[in-house]
Amino acid sequence: MARVLRDQLLIDSPVAIEDSASAAWERTTEACGLTAGVMGGLGGARCRTVAAHAVHNGLTQLPACHHVLHGEKVGFGILVQLRLEEHLGDNRLAAQAHRQLKPVLKSLGLPVCLDDLGLANVTASELQTVCEFACQDGSDLHHLPFKVTPDALQDALVGLSERSPVRS
């Protein structure tokens, strides 16, 4: 079901963004609402974008990205989750999904790196705050099939940066 949703988004999202009266927009919104709802409802917390929402929650700790919408932070969080799955879970399919998703998000004007979130000048200490919040006890992040520490999450966040490294 997740692959169907992904494929629908890869196919229809460019047209859907341009024309909210199009059939592509209707298919995209239905796919997001219905498929995500069914998956989350049937599979529970283990079938949701667990790291993506944890990343969103962590990013809320930084005023510099308060202007970024919830869905934009979650979209960025999906890229982070795929990076975690690739590096910590040794998942080559996650690497392929990352390579497919990143250019689509970028073409839609959605954030794909820290700079896009307004965090071009983020410090390592600020990122540590984000990661500790995202990794706190009870976080959905811990539903992943491998352990994610704040340091591992910070590596994934910084690894998505397209420009300069994080300041000390």
What are these regions (language model features)?
Residues 1-107:
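Active-site segments that bind and position negatively charged phosphate/pyrophosphate groups
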Residues 90-168:
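C-terminal charged capping/lid subdomain of soluble metabolic enzymes
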